[in-house]
Amino acid sequence: VARPVIFVLAGVNGAGKSTAGERELTQAGLTWFNPDTFTRQLIKTTGAPPAEANAAAWQAGVRQLDAAIAGRTDYAFETTLGGNTIAAKLREASKTHDVLMWFVGLGSPEHHLARIKLRVSRGGHDIPETKVRERFESSRRNLIALLPYLSQLQVYDNSVDATIGQPMP
């Protein structure tokens, strides 16, 4: 009997997680929880301030992950992997699930910050510089600590920028 799967699309803000993973996951028939998308929906439907909507989206994602672990069901989600909560839950999930991760990274915090600045110039959301710098280190520490618990890991260096509409380098 196949074990249920927890699929994790991880990486620091601005790494290109959504861009790199959305098409592949959708083509594979997976619906996944993207906290940024959920935050935008909450702001639009409830008028909640961005910080409040972001916190609610994060909590919703954690509840869904908890439900998938408890119910032994498949779940796919996106995370920065910057904090301790998700890493602990993935260790727990590995007891009953195959935990598969795609980790999308860039070579420096400065590159993440430049990508975020570009995203903001196009109407996207900003992330404080201190958070990006913290997550650059903590996400890698969490990734290394999770290695024994992952059934599969693919790491993507997304440092080469591509022009929209052009083939990926």
Each model region followed by its residue ranges:
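P-loop (Walker A) phosphate-binding loop of NTP-binding proteins
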Residues: 12
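Conserved glycine(s) of the Walker
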Residues: 16
